[in-house]
Amino acid sequence: MAELTALESLIEMGFPRGRAEKALALTGNQGIEAAMDWLMEHEDDPDVDEPLETPLSHVLGREPTPSEQVGPEGSGSAAGESRPILTEEERQEQTKRMLELVAQKQREREEREEREALEREKQRRRQGQELSVARQKLQEDEMRRAAEERRREKAEELAARQRVREKIERDKAERAKKYGGSVGSRSSPPATDPGPVPSSPSQEPPTKREYDQCRIQVRLPDGTSLTQTFRAREQLAAVRLYVELHRGEEPGQDQDPVQLLSGFPRRAFSEADMERPLQELGLVPSAVLIVAKKCPS
């Protein structure tokens, strides 16, 4: 049975003549399968239908060489030698084979593209998972650093409070050593109320007595009281610090600032008063103070 040439087969399958000739020429006339592979790979190229450059043998006034006169099939047949004419049945059979080959090539191409798309999707998911893991690790590192920073700040705060307590204890020990006796006990004996009361306004006031110490009783909001002996020249801030450290709250618990009041005459001591000596504030030789929670400014 006579067969169609490669060019005729491609045209029979529906490819444009110019595109078929271009495919055969660019594949070196290696057969219909090579030409079909080229056509499928380049069917979307914008210049797929542009003609090839004119061969030298087609230049005006140039005679083709004997090798250029050979047909694209490379059969070497002499010019004018005719090929057998195909019957309609043979043409249909050959066209059917070519269409099956085209369908096979198309399936192979689709399968290849599907595999490539699947691989791209796997790569995208893999990159997404890696990005999610990296983001989660970054968040965990930030949370861990924040927790460590909070622990460090808490430890520094507790250490600062401990240093203040130790300073108070050292001051108490120094006062006890200097003046003798126990200082800082809540059950300290009450100081004797000094001086006689004048019987009449016209009576001469007694000579004012100088005191080196003063006894301060502090009444807390919960009904308990603290008693402490201070030097007369100590500032009122020492009394407030003593109250803040001994008012019975748990160590490390946030404590509200306190304000000191005198019962009679009624007086609220200001921040400026905290820098004044107890003697100057009239709290010597003894006084009773009331603790009130200070509203934050």
UniProtKB/Swiss-Prot annotation:
Ranges where the UBA domain occurs: 2-42
Transmembrane helix keyword on record: no
Residues annotated with Phosphothreonine modification: T207, T229
GO MF annotation, one: K6-linked polyubiquitin modification-dependent protein binding
Region annotated Disordered, chain positions: 38-214
Domain UBX per the UniProt entry, residue ranges: 209-291
Modified residues (N-acetylalanine): A2
Gene: Ubxn1
Protein name, entry field: UBX domain-containing protein 1
Subcellular location field: Cytoplasm
Location of region: Interaction with BRCA1: 43-297
Chain intervals with Basic and acidic residues compositional bias: 86-122, 137-177
Domain remarks: The UBA domain specifically recognizes and binds 'Lys-6'-linked polyubiquitin chains.
Gene3D superfamilies reported for this sequence: DNA helicase RuvA subunit, C-terminal domain, Phosphatidylinositol 3-kinase Catalytic Subunit, Chain A, domain 1
Biased composition (Acidic residues): 42-52
GO biological process terms held by the UniProt record: negative regulation of ERAD pathway; negative regulation of proteasomal ubiquitin-dependent protein catabolic process; negative regulation of protein K48-linked deubiquitination; negative regulation of protein ubiquitination
Role summary: Ubiquitin-binding protein that plays a role in the modulation of innate immune response. Blocks both the RIG-I-like receptors (RLR) and NF-kappa-B pathways. Following viral infection, UBXN1 is induced and recruited to the RLR component MAVS. In turn, interferes with MAVS oligomerization, and disrupts the MAVS/TRAF3/TRAF6 signalosome. This function probably serves as a brake to prevent excessive RLR signaling. Interferes with the TNFalpha-triggered NF-kappa-B pathway by interacting with cellular inhibitors of apoptosis proteins (cIAPs) and thereby inhibiting their recruitment to TNFR1.
PROSITE patterns: UBA, UBX
Keywords of this entry: Acetylation, Coiled coil, Cytoplasm, Phosphoprotein
Protein's UniProt keywords contain Cytoplasm: yes
Family matches, as SUPFAM superfamilies: UBA-like, Ubiquitin-like
CDD domains reported in the protein's UniProt record: UBA_UBXN1, UBX_UBXN1
Subunit structure: Interacts with MAVS; this interaction prevents MAVS oligomerization and thus disrupts the RLR signaling pathway. Interacts with CUL1; this interaction inhibits CUL1-mediated degradation of NF-kappa-B inhibitors. Interacts with BIRC2/c-IAP1; this interaction prevents TNFalpha-stimulated RIP1 ubiquitination and subsequent NF-kappa-B activation. Component of a complex required to couple retrotranslocation, ubiquitination and deglycosylation composed of NGLY1, SAKS1, AMFR, VCP and RAD23B. Interacts with HOMER2. Interacts directly with VCP.
Source taxon at top rank: Eukaryota
GO CC, one annotated term: cytosol
